[in-house]
């Protein structure tokens, strides 16, 4: 698995481009500088299989609309953050504009897509979704959407030739998630866990007690797990258990 980190925006967000032999990439947290992300994709001959968001804060998603316009791949964001991520509540930091919302259709990401023109599969969410009266319509137009993750647990995901688990780690925001590539011993922790620190909880939706439980969950990952946080340097779970007060205390 290949990983290219691009540090973007005034708040120096670590945007990650991840790909395997299939040359179909996952873009994690396109916070700013869409042209720089595009340059990495072009240099490595990559298409975009999906855009993964660790949480909804503006500094992590402000290049989303521009990137998605060029690469209309599915976008994944937890339901708890999708509620406010594209509203005035998300002018955090305040000098960032309100993130532009790509065309959104709330779907269940655990269901596989069906080809355009084929009938829905009875008994799945390709029939009306959770009483919302929406149908999973996988036409080209419907691919411009945000796939809302809700209750994802730690079920294995496979996108292109990449296998990973999505870990719910609320606290910094209600919908924070981490992307754990178990076979590669890599976890993208967003703003939940940093080298030597953890995410702040004084912003709207933050909760220190809930974050403590999320940190405990991450502390139980294999010690050799490489940590790529939303800001700052890389680390490992082993190093953080030895040196990070916030992880040690939980």
Question: What are the residue ranges of the model-derived segments?
Answer:
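Short catalytic-loop micro-motif centered on adjacent basic/acidic residues
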Residues: 26-28, 50-52, 166-168
